């Protein structure tokens, strides 16, 4: 049976996952709630500077955007509790405004009639986080869940493969992350993060991230063993994780690469990738895998200390796994 989905917040992630959902037979987007008018929503969906023109026929009226003749209801309601999820028989709401990251806030979608809620960002309280390749199998029917962050979706599968095979002692992660909509194009005020207010096009900007710590929440065996930071860089999309890790079971870099390659073909298929090509970031634009290991970019100091590199499209890969989580929560 098709899962009826409503999207609250039609920003970068909302639009990318909408495009991806059009390729899936198990998910149907029924409604979008955003403060933008249907005309502007249709325009932003059709034309995208990063992912190109959307190859569907798009029109609109005062209450809908229309994709290949199919109406998708559009509303502009600020309070999630007042949304019409019940009237539209919505099974799962994707909460992608970036604003409602606490249980009490996300629960308003349940009060409005949705059966389940998937939050597209790391939760700010006890909303459980689920990452494909890490802990999807532990889902027990919770009504409100988080898909964590794009960086956690890259780091967690890689960390699990290393920990399962070699036993992680401790590690530090750096993500070299593409610019996002929260940054300033030129220098501007950012009271909570002074460096974050500097011009995104002109600077490499050090930043904090909870992505590595969040791995310990989806993989409890790694709790307290990983932490990390970010550099925001002037590219529009695609990011890369640098995981420097110490592990128990001695192994050469080649042996580690072999285990990662095997995992990408078996238990991590559809999640992790493996490449020995001379790749750069734009080669992964539009990639739905969330962690593509770059064998030629990493190195080892000895048989217990290694640097591992994995690429990810921080928009497409993450959005793909949000839809996988929607599919998961609809079944229990």
From Swiss-Prot:
Protein residues bound to NAD(+): 12-13, 34, 78, 120, 314
Alphabetized UniProt keyword annotations = Cytoplasm, Glycolysis, NAD, Nucleotide-binding, Oxidoreductase
UniProt: D-glyceraldehyde 3-phosphate binding residues: 149-151, 180, 209-210, 232
The active site consists of: 150 (nucleophile)
Q: According to its UniProt record, where is this protein mainly located?
A: cytoplasm
**Keyword field contains Nucleotide-binding:** yes
Q: Which PROSITE patterns match?
A: GAPDH (PS00071)
Its recorded name reads: Glyceraldehyde-3-phosphate dehydrogenase
Originating species: Buchnera aphidicola subsp. Acyrthosiphon pisum (strain APS)
Q: What is the lineage of its organism?
A: Bacteria, Pseudomonadati, Pseudomonadota, Gammaproteobacteria, Enterobacterales
């Amino acid at each position: 049976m098709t899962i009826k989905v409503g999207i609250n917040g039609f920003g970068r992630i909302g639009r990318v996952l909408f495009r991806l959902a059009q390729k899936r037979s198990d998910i149907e987007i029924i409604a979008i709630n955003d403060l933008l008018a249907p005309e502007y929503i249709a325009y932003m969906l059709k034309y995208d500077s990063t992912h190109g023109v959307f190859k569907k026929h798009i029109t609109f009226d005062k209450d809908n955007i229309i994709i290949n003749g199919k109406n998708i209801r559009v509303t502009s309601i600020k309070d999630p509790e007042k949304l019409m999820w019940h009237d539209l028989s919505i099974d799962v709401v994707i909460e992608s405004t970036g604003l409602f990251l606490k249980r009490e806030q996300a629960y308003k979608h349940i009060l409005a009639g949705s059966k389940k809620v998937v939050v597209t960002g790391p939760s700010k309280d006890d909303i459980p986080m689920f990452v494909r390749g890490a802990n999807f199998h532990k889902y027990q029917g919770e009504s409100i869940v988080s898909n964590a962050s794009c960086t956690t979706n890259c780091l967690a599968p890689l960390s699990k493969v290393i920990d399962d095979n070699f036993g992680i002692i401790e590690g530090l992660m750096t993500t070299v992350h593409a610019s996002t909509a929260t940054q300033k194009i030129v220098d501007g005020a950012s009271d909570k993060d002074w460096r974050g207010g500097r011009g995104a096009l002109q600077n490499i900007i050090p930043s904090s991230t909870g992505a590595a710590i969040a791995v310990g929440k989806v993989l409890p065996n790694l709790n307290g063993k990983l932490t990390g930071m970010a550099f925001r860089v002037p590219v529009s999309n695609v990011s890369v994780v640098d995981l420097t890790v110490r592990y128990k079971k001695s192994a050469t870099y080649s042996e580690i690469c072999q285990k990662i390659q095997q995992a990408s073909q078996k238990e991590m298929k559809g999640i992790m990738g493996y490449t020995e090509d001379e790749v750069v970031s734009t080669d992964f634009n539009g990639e739905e895998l969330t962690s593509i290991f770059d064998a030629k970019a990493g190195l080892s100091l000895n048989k217990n200390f290694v640097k591992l590199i994995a690429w990810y499209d921080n928009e497409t890969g993450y959005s793909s796994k949000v839809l996988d989580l929607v599919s998961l929560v609809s079944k229990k």
